Amino acid sequence: MKRLLSRLGKWEYKWLCLLVVVVLALHFAIIKIPDKPVFDEMHYITDARVIISGQETERGEHPSLGKLFIVAGDYIFNGFKTPEVYTGATTGEFLGSNSDGNMMLTVSDASLLNTGQTIIIDKELMEITATDNGLNQITVKRGLGGTAVAYHEPPESIYVFKDDALSWRFFSVILSAISIILFYLICRNLSMSRRASLLATFLLSFENFTFLYSGMAMLDVSSLTFTLAAFWLYLRGNYPASGIMVALSALAKLNGALAIIAILLHWLIVRRDRIWKFVGLIVFAPVFFVLLMPLTDYYPFHGWVNPLERIMTMLKGSASLTFANVSGTYPQKPIEWIFRWDLTPYYFHPNYLAVVSYTVEFLIVPVLIYLLIRALGLDTKFWLSIIRLPNKIWLFVIKLPGRIRLIRAKPLEGLELSQTQEEAPELSQIYTVKLETSRAHNDAGIFALCWFTATYLFWIPAVWITDRVTYPYYIYPTIGAICIGLGMGFEQLVRLFEVRKSGKLKWSAISIVVIFLLAHLAFFVLMSPLTYYWGGPIFRGLQS
């Protein structure tokens, strides 16, 4: 037993496993809250119901793999049977194709139906908003989830869906747990220390927007999991397999194709190895995207579909969504994703507040600067900073690695002030301070910047050129790159605490880390849907 405990204590992944278990427990604690679709879940859950009922998908603008995870959850949690059940009721009047919104509908027996149920009549989904058993009437919201408002001649059978939130969201929660594991493995394959990797993974796991989105029945969740799998396989050197994962990411949601940009940039900057295997990655991604598309489309379309025609349909549908023709408060240009800090409510009570944790969002720009500094150490003598200062210089950074040099314009050069707290010489000129280091380039810094470029910076010229509408939740796959930078930075502060014997700098470093982590958890507690579940009236009031 002692030997087992000793091995467990030395096992690298014990804290990662604990983190995954905690996150899964929190997700499953609220997976059924609310028991109705939240935000864009409505589109994908409705489409899953359409597919299950034997009809062709209504959301042809998206690839099908992400939808199949929702469909699979419905089947598994309904005993591998369709959750669509005949109610015993039929329609008692004509329904016109021009009558949308809420309307009264006479049925054969209203007592068989309940308020809040989703029903399907032919191919049209409706939500029951009220019932009147005495008059055998129900009030329905027509065209639910974008299904076509159609003409219905009585009597038509009314079916109700018996699926629930657990079946819709189950695979999103499982895939999000897999994403946490993959993210940690990515950090380790970037030569980050165990501590830095765990810090980054902790920050990502309890980042509000990531947690919120990871528990929703959305296509982006499965797409991100395959993206992270592609990154991990690439960093391990499994190039062809990485290309297949990129294809699967794009088959879940087209945005997943951006993963190949991050991989290509990193390979060109850092690796440039095994060129033919890397060419295999670049070739496998589009080839498997096309080859696997008919398989993923077969059930949603209930037949074989030409993948090239599907691709053209998706691209045309995407191109038609521009800022010029899409209204509402949700569309935002990419620059607003990181500089607009307002909350976007998806649902109230429990509150689904779509906002990147401020502990992360406020530091996006500083973290990018830090990552750039770490990434640019491409040679053994990298000039970390060049700052022009007045003639008096106080060397308050004496413990930084490297040497501090005070260099004057020619002919005087190389006046060295290394490792001293003395005031700089009284000279009348302006000097240049340089910190000379011996670090090589930092692979994690470079990869995080490539990741950020592919999933965020790409959208800036794309929107400028095409006017393609974008939404703030498009930042979801980018957050991991920022957490890598935060993990690296905080690990350096912890190391500074360890190497310093005493002094204010020692305790300041560890205080920054502790305060930040507590603030990060506090924001998560106050903003996540979990607050409503465990927090009582105080936290509910704070969120209202």
List the predicted regions and their residue ranges.
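Transmembrane-helix motifs of polytopic, lipid-linked glycan transferases
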Residues: 21, 166-191, 198, 229, ...
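Short acidic/glycine- and proline-prone juxtamembrane loop motifs at membrane-interface regions
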Residues: 38-39, 209-220
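Autoprocessing Asn-cyclization modules and mimics
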Residues: 82-153
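Transmembrane helical bundles and short interhelical boundary loops of multi-pass, membrane-embedded
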Residues: 281, 321, 389, 393, ...
